[in-house]
A protein has these predicted regions:
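Generic beta-strand structural signal
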Residues: 95, 120-123, 140, 163, ...
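Short, charged beta->alpha transition segments
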Residues: 80-86, 128-130, 159-166
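Short, flexible loop segments at the rims of nucleotide/cofactor-binding pockets, characterized by
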Residues: 59, 72-78, 101, 149-154, ...
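Catalytic core of membrane glycerolipid acyltransferases/transacylases, capturing the structured
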Residues: 40, 48-52, 96-152
Length: 291
């Protein structure tokens, strides 16, 4: 009896919650992480993908405000940015900035570094998972769920509400309308997937000029290698393809503002036209306006 009472009095150990980096990796690789091979494969993948560095970064920014967290990541990466066309960027007033997406999260860091001196009020559309790493990102990132199957009415309402507040406050909003990394097309040219028309619709609704931006950065080697044979392996490279850009060079080209009333009334058509301009004209002739 005494032994039984003693056993009942001993608190049951509670497992510590999984680290957010582990959670995000396993969510992106559900089949692999539930397979019998995962305990064997995981240490190898984590070593390859720089898991320790990703975890350290996540722990560092978790308690920070959004601006401090973004500056921390910017300082951590110390990306070298060559900027052209900065004179085209309006210094005040509402803007919707749209750009291609060649390398991953580092594209946003490079754009931030390039534009923050002129537009310190810049805020980004970003995958909603970023806020799970750092809740303070509300200051600098608007959470967006790019995967249609994961969208909910509440998440969409939050995105739209924050968008309205940002543009009514005359801030600059940066969007990567592809929502996914670029791939090589049939001709071997790095090309974004079809751009979602959201950014154009928002610009038209709030009468905000659109500033096109072209981003050129280092090749995302592991992302494209894994993309050939496994979508899950490809998707868990997100932290690796951010942190391995440390000290690397990006080129940012800024085009002339596009008045929203000059666009095709069909947002999808207008979005496709701007995408073509950003990818095929802007990096070679930044002074040539979109027509």
């Amino acid at each position: 009896m005494a032994d039984a009472a003693l056993a009942r009095s001993v608190p049951t150990a509670v497992a510590a919650p999984a680290h957010i980096v582990d959670v995000l990796i396993e969510e992106r690789a559900p089949k692999l992480s539930r397979s019998a091979a995962w305990p064997v494969v995981r240490p190898l993948l984590y070593a390859l993908l720089g898991y320790g560095k990703a975890r350290a970064m996540a722990d560092a920014i978790a308690p920070m405000g959004g601006k401090a967290a973004l500056d921390f990541v910017s300082d951590l990466l110390a990306i070298k940015v060559d900027v052209s066309g900065l004179q085209h960027l309006p210094r005040k007033g509402r803007l919707v900035i749209v750009g291609n997406h060649p390398t991953g999260i580092a594209d946003g860091v490079a754009v931030y570094d390039a534009l923050k001196a002129v537009r310190p009020d810049i805020i980004f559309y970003a995958n909603s998972d970023a806020h799970r790493v750092c809740a303070g990102f509300d200051e600098t990132l608007i959470p967006v769920e790019w995967v249609a199957a994961k969208r909910t009415r509440d998440r969409t309402r939050l995105t739209l509400t924050m968008t309205r507040e940002v543009l009514e406050a005359e801030r600059a909003l940066m969007v990567f309308p592809a929502g996914k990394l670029a791939r090589r097309d049939a001709h071997g040219v790095l090309t974004d997937p079809t751009w979602m028309p959201t950014a154009i619709s928002v610009a038209v609704k709030y009468r905000a000029p659109i500033v096109p931006v072209h981003v050129e950065g280092p090749w995302a080697t592991l992302f494209h290698l894994f993309d050939r044979f496994s979508g899950e392996l490809r998707d868990i490279t997100l932290f690796h393809e951010l942190l391995n850009k440390s000290g690397q060079r990006f080129r940012i080209t800024i085009g002339k503002p596009i008045p929203p009333d000059r666009l095709d009334p069909d947002a999808a058509v207008a979005s496709a036209a701007i995408k073509t301009y950003v990818e095929r004209t802007l990096p070679f002739d930044p002074d040539r306006p979109f027509v």
